[in-house]
Swiss-Prot record:
Fe cation binds at residues 167, 182. Its EC number is 2.4.2.60. This is Thiamine thiazole synthase. The gene is thi4. Pathway: Cofactor biosynthesis; thiamine diphosphate biosynthesis. It is an enzyme of class 2 (transferase). Its cofactor is Fe(2+). Pfam families: Thi4. NAD(+) binds at residues 42, 61-62, 69, 167, 257. Residues 202-232 are annotated as: Disordered. Keywords: Iron, Metal-binding, NAD, Thiamine biosynthesis, Transferase.
Amino acid sequence: MSFDEFADVSEAQVTRAIAKDWGNEFIDRVDTEVIIVGGGPSGLVTAKELAERGVDVTIVEKNNYLGGGFWLGGFLMNKVTVRDPAQSVLDELDVPYEESDEASGLYVADGPHAVSSLIKSACDAGAEVQNMTEFTDVVTRENHRVGGIVLNWTPVHALPRELTCVDPVAVESDLVVDSTGHDAVVISKLSERGVLNAPGIEHANEHNTGMDNTADDEYGAPGHDSPGHDSMWVSRSEDQVVEHTGVVHPGVVATGMAVATVEGLPRMGPTFGAMLLSGKRGAQACLNELGREATPIDFTPAAPADD
């Protein structure tokens, strides 16, 4: 069978098409309702829930890919776990899973299937993505209320300082969500400025450990650990992360592992139920702060009735 030719398009036309569409979208997103810093599982859930309710949402992600650590379930194994009742989120995403024979209420799914479905659902809902873009600071208003973020291209940070004198730019928003995981970069910046008391970060500073500043290519790189949170305790950590999710500073909501770092909570390791439900609770906190009338977000689904 013969193949019909592709459309006759020049290289310049391809470049203009990319640049025009990207530029128009970026200009449209310079002033938005909610900026979510970090495109891991909690940030993606927050973005999905808000976008489904008509909120203008932009995800700012420093990597070229979304999903954070949700691609793998620990030790380079690509099976992820959630504990009851977080499997309800997998149901919403049509992600298949099985109950483990290790414990009742422990469910296992394929990481790539789960994270790709979550990314698709957030994008389908209308969330916009600015990837390869790094948070560098916050935009502040009266009484240190956060009114946006300062950002730059991720590669700028990777180049030697003597080669890069590249000013960042600022974008405005009604709310900023810190979904940056262990590093809690938005809240860490506010703590550094002395305008927010974060127990976990303060504890790290008092004990002279500080937050993790190792380079991305060094052992102990950001994202692997943080002295802001406590050591692993799965059963306690997940409940507390969801419980403490919400507004942490005027204009700022924290979700996911950023909550553990801010509050000094235990880490939970490779189980993701708290990330998913924290994302839902964070979205509801945003709706409340925005004063939006919308269908409430159920982050504590009831157990199904017995047949």
